[in-house]
Amino acid sequence: MKRHHALLAMLSLAALPCAAQTLKLYDNFDHKPINTSKWAYAFCFSSNGLEMECVREIRDEQLHLTHRHFGVRANDGGQQNGSAGVGFANAQNIKAIRTDVTVRTNFEVACAANPNFGSNTGLWGTFFNPGSGNPTDDVGAALNLKRVASDPPGQLQVIGQTFQAGIYSPFTSLGWVAIGTPVTIGLAWDQPNHQFIISLTNKVTHVTTSATMPYTFSDTTPAAGPAKVMQAGGFTSDCAANATSLYVDAVYDNVYIGQ
């Protein structure tokens, strides 16, 4: 039913760096329900348990993810994490992911005194361990369509980060897109060059932007807690002055992987 989409995706793969050229179609969500042989788990999560809407379903031949959660009305010093998502089966074998995604709605009730949190919709994964064998030390990377309250109205920034043991690298930005813009995002582990490759294609302008995120860790040990995830959600600010919340609605399609 989506052969034309698959063809376009394969043509676009030819322009990717070598680390991501062997991608193959993983799921195009043509059939309900969510395929448990491809998606090992799904989640609705809020770190404080304060959530309302949560959707994880195939609708109109796309994976539909929606989540709304709330901050704590206590002080101005923290945040609450929440999201809806799905985890790839056989995550330890996946080295690259490419998917279409559209953030259709991104609405935040923010906190003026604690404004630096917001949405994160996209991909993340753990790829290797630096040698300790402890899963909390696994090295990973993320690529998200992100928004905080101070960003330009209606805009999402597409950013990548690496992380290890709870420490995150500075953002690597691929630019901005308007909410509602269909895009294709890619995240790949380029082990021979000790870096991650991130990419963004705006499906309206057909402009592709890519960047590398190098690291200095030893990368010969497999991840102790391998995971690859697609999600929609983010962080709400704790706030003394007002109730805060974050609502994100997104659709994913045409997921490709490299092994």
Regions found by a protein language model. Name each.
Residues 28, 72, 94-96, 215-259:
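Ligand-recognition surfaces built from glycine- and aromatic
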Residues 64-157:
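Secretory/extracellular carbohydrate-interaction modules
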Residues 20-21:
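Boundary of Sec targeting at the N-terminus
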Residues 29, 181-189, 196-198:
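Short tryptophan-centered beta-strand motifs in secreted/extracellular beta-sheet-rich domains
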Residues 15-17:
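N-terminal signal peptide c-region/cleavage motif recognized by signal peptidases
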Residues 159-186:
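Short, aromatic/His-centered strand-loop micro-motif at the edge of beta-sheets
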Residues 28-53:
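Short, tryptophan-glycine- and acidic/Ser/Thr-enriched carbohydrate-recognition patches
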Residues 1-8:
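Bacterial N-terminal signal peptides that target proteins for export
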